[in-house]
């Protein structure tokens, strides 16, 4: 696994969690909204006795459990990446990698926080990635 791929694992998982949160919001809206009546003629052999919103409530419960598990996994991956970043010797490079891959800051935000120009910050980031790949197995 490339160093960049290893470092991006928390970011990817965080995006998946955010997508699940959006999906959870849709399910919550659907569980509160009335369903439209069906005017077509149909004769179910096994009538459904559950209210229409119950299936959305079940999906909400399942999704909330998945999100909780994903947060636990995200913490584990962040700890693993944080320990791997310690391999880099330069503290400024470590700081750049932590801002980027553990706090999910954008390049302009990192450059503002570190009081560097964006161009210099990108150069330091490339150098930090090279140092990380040399030290990480």
Which residues make up each language-model segment?
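N-terminal interaction/assembly modules
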Residues: 1-87, 134-137
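Short amphipathic alpha helix immediately N-terminal
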Residues: 89-103
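N-terminal positioning helix adjacent to the helix-turn-helix/winged-helix DNA-binding module
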Residues: 77-80, 91-93, 124
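DNA major-groove recognition helices of helix-turn-helix
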Residues: 121-132
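Short alpha-helical "recognition helix" segments of helix-turn-helix
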Residues: 109-114
